[in-house]
């Protein structure tokens, strides 16, 4: 699949996609994420720069569960924004978790 096509698909999604590698470094932001976060986060930043200690623990726990075989996991519901947050592991062709993204579904 061509990179441009894949990027177009990700940019068409109505929710933010922020992909991080196993070191929790932001490697990709789709168009919606760039619009939402603006200058607050950038590719190359640690995802923990925009998360508190409680969120950091959750992310570490989700990554551990993903390594054990879990797929997308519900993270939280934000009643103020009326959105559900999910943690989604990304695996390579051998099934090894190479990173993750958090996505937000607006209701």
Where are these regions (language model features)?
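Sensory/regulatory domains in signal-transduction proteins
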Residues: 32-107
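Sensory modules in modular signal-transduction proteins
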Residues: 1-29
């Amino acid at each position: 699949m061509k990179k441009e096509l894949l990027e177009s698909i990700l940019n068409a999604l109505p929710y933010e996609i922020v992909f991080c590698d196993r070191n929790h470094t932001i490697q990709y932001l789709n168009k919606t994420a760039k619009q939402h976060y603006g200058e607050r986060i950038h590719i190359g930043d640690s995802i923990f720069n925009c998360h508190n200690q409680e969120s950091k623990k959750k992310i570490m726990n989700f990554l551990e569960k993903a390594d054990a075989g879990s797929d997308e996991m519900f993270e939280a519901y934000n009643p103020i924004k009326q959105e559900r947050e999910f943690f989604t592991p990304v695996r390579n062709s051998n099934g090894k978790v190479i990173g993750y993204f958090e996505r937000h579904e607006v209701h």
